[in-house]
UniProtKB/Swiss-Prot annotation:
SUPFAM superfamilies: Actin-like ATPase domain. GO terms for cellular component: cytoplasm. InterPro entries: ATPase_NBD, Gcp-like_dom, KAE1/TsaD, Peptidase_M22_CS, TsaD. It catalyses: L-threonylcarbamoyladenylate + adenosine(37) in tRNA = N(6)-L-threonylcarbamoyladenosine(37) in tRNA + AMP + H(+). Its main location: cytoplasm. GO terms for molecular function: iron ion binding; N(6)-L-threonylcarbamoyladenine synthase activity. Its EC number is 2.3.1.234. Transmembrane segments: none annotated. It comes from Legionella pneumophila (strain Paris). Belongs to the KAE1 / TsaD family. It comes from the Bacteria. This is tRNA N6-adenosine threonylcarbamoyltransferase. PANTHER family: TRNA N6-ADENOSINE THREONYLCARBAMOYLTRANSFERASE (PTHR11735), TRNA N6-ADENOSINE THREONYLCARBAMOYLTRANSFERASE, MITOCHONDRIAL (PTHR11735:SF6).
Length: 333
């Protein structure tokens, strides 16, 4: 089965072709960072317009790379939510229209489900059940994954998502958008820090997260410093250490409470070097398994949507109609 995947939930336009027999045939991505940098963050209207401009060229590109024609496609999967409503509508309208023209099924895909399954796309031997740590700019959740479509929410953020906390903390210290990755890089390059930040919500039971207080702690520390570049790096180091250790503590609890020692890390923050290293060390100590998508599949992309769509379409699923329906807010579990 050949499935075209379309991702347009926020500020990246992703398109891919996945084959149920041969795997990922091609994928392409357009990032809108340059468009939004001058505004200091994502502007929804501009994001939607950019998707309109790039969807058709990207579809042509992936079909050419895969050496297939449109009429060879068996289905089209598209992100229907959660995300920015305008951006979602662009992708869904395009997908449904193309599917209608080709007389093939279209299927709405949950953005977070696509992230959860991205590691399985590269490692088909990854079996259910597993615990997933979903860490991105919009989400920070621990999820028990028992099968495709069978999810149980174990813990969620009460305020900022972890990627959001990185970006906001960076902005508070004068690092331009998108600052989260720059902040992490400063932390990685800093050998040591005199600062010790709190590990929020680790002194009580449960698997929920909270990062807004950590962000405030970083701001206060920055304002009390001489605001030199070395101060920025040391605060970044302390902030990242606190975030990573907090995530590790919560993952330890989730694994201990579950019947599985398999952990999957999903979402853009899954590319963080310090987090990857710490999780690999811990999981090795408990003789467990940890799975990360390749860096290019951590952030939003069309490949994960095409893969999730292929899995569901092979079970006979489709939208069953041509009406367009997106869900900007769409709980996974």
């Amino acid at each position: 089965m050949l499935v075209l995947g379309i991702e347009s939930s926020c500020d990246e336009t992703g398109v891919a072709v996945y084959d149920s027999e041969s795997g990922l045939l091609s994928h392409a991505l357009h990032s809108q960072i340059a468009t939004h940098r001058v505004h200091g963050g994502v502007v929804p209207e501009l994001a939607s317009r950019d998707h309109v401009n790039y969807l058709v060229p990207l579809v042509d590109e992936v079909l050419t790379k895969a050496q297939i024609r449109k009429n060879q496609l068996d289905g089209i999967a598209y992100t229907a939510g959660p995300g920015l409503i305008g951006a979602l509508l662009v992708g869904s309208c395009f997908a449904k229209s193309l599917a209608y023209a080709l007389n093939i099924p279209a299927l709405a895909i949950h953005h977070l489900e696509a992230h959860l399954l991205a590691a399985k796309m590269e490692t088909p031997s990854l079996d259910f059940p597993f615990i997933a740590l979903l860490v991105s700019g919009g989400h920070c959740q621990l999820i028990e994954v028992n099968n495709i479509g069978e999810y149980r929410l174990l813990g969620d953020t009460l305020d900022d998502a972890v990627g959001e906390a990185f970006d906001k903390t960076a902005k508070l210290m004068g690092i331009p958008y998108p600052g989260g990755a720059v902040l992490a890089n400063l932390a990685d390059q800093c050998l040591s820090t005199p600062y010790q930040f709190p590990r929020p919500m680790t002194d009580r039971p449960g698997l929920d997260f909270s990062f807004s207080g950590l962000k405030t702690h970083a701001l206060n520390t920055w304002n009390q410093s001489e605001k030199k570049e070395s101060d920025r790096s040391e605060i970044a180091k302390a902030f990242q250490q606190a975030v990573v250790e907090t995530l590790i503590i919560k993952c330890k609890r989730a694994i201990k409470e579950s019947q599985s020692k398999r952990l999957v890390v999903a979402g853009g923050v899954g590319a963080n070097k310090a987090l990857r290293s710490a999780l690999q060390k811990w999981i090795k100590d408990i003789k467990g398994e940890v799975y990360f998508p390749a860096l290019e599949y951590c952030t939003d992309n069309g490949a994960m949507v095409a893969y999730a769509g292929c899995l569901r379409m092979m079970r006979g699923e489709s939208d069953g109609g041509w009406g367009v329906m997106v869900k900007p807010r769409w709980p996974l579990a």
